[in-house]
Amino acid sequence: MAQYKGAASEAGRAMQLMKKREKQREQLEQMKLKIAEENVVKANINKKFSAHYDAVEAELKSSTVGLVTLNDMKAKQEALVKEREKQLAKKEQFKDLQLMLEKQRERERKKEQKRKIASLSFNLEEDEECEDEEGEEEESDKEDPPEEKKKKKKKKLGKNPDVDTSFLPDRDREEEENRLREELRQEWEHKQEKIKSEEIEITFSYWDGSGHRRTVKMKKGNSIQQFLQKALESLRKDFSELRSAGVEQLMYIKEDLIIPHHHSFYDFIVTKARGKSGPLFNFDVHEDVRLLSDATVEKDESHAGKVVLRSWYEKNKHIFPASRWEPYDPEKKWDKYTIR
């Protein structure tokens, strides 16, 4: 009967194996953290795109100096809108990736705690069986040819099923994670396209010193320029000064903010943007957006946006209400609403 031999040497080998696996796990964790940090750096670049709105508006204004065709201006604005949508998509993808990384780190942390509590165990019965097999192999090696001896020497100890190997590289797991990311991206894009195709009713007021209220139906993905074009078509028959005007001569004022033409209604809806006197993501109309008891408490109500000629604004921008209007800045936050 075989006897158990080499307990000290086996313990030393087990200790070396544990140290080696711990070192591999630490290297893998460092690689994961490095990849996550690189993704954060890339995502931080995406956060800066909103600060370029003023530069974009300035570029559009400079490009319309002189004789510039409406088609050229539309092409530039459509290109800016597409770029905006790409940036939003990248930002959402990064959020999903960060969430997955946080979950993965939490799982690794829990597994690490379990490993510290539970000691590495070896099945002594399997060791005895291995020794019995080795004794039989030594006897049979004397009779076996050299080729058979080489094959037997290649035989290694079996893997311990109780040891956690989740921290080791796994191609199948990585492919599954990539597949999950792609499914999330496609699902998010499909959801956004569905939102953009939804129809909304826009209430606006043509302002020439007094208000003339109208309503038009648009899709959430339409730009402010497309909205002004449709509004202009409905107003031309009633206002002679608009019959020769183009969409580039109109301004859209929402909650005392001058909204650039290249923005879409979708931009304000998904970001829950706010203006000086109410939310920018609601386009129906109520009498007031402030509670009588507390002017700082916001309600989901808004004022009708104003459509004005740029020439009228230049002549009357020192007079109320035009004196309150200012260009929209996505970086500026309006924590409370006021009336002067």
Curated annotation (Swiss-Prot):
Oxidoreductase keyword on record: no
Q: Enumerate composition-biased segments (Basic and acidic residues).
A: 169-178
This one is known as Protein FAM50A-A
User: Where is this protein localized, as stated in its record?
Assistant: Nucleus
Entry-linked InterPro entries: FAM50A/XAP5_C, XAP5
Single biological process term from Gene Ontology: RNA splicing
| Chain's role | Probably involved in the regulation of pre-mRNA splicing.
Query: Where mainly found?
Result: nucleus
What residue spans carry the Acidic residues bias annotation? 124-146
Keywords annotated in UniProt? mRNA processing, mRNA splicing, Nucleus
Nucleus keyword on record: yes
Q: Could you give one GO CC term from the UniProt record?
A: nucleus
A Pfam short name: XAP5
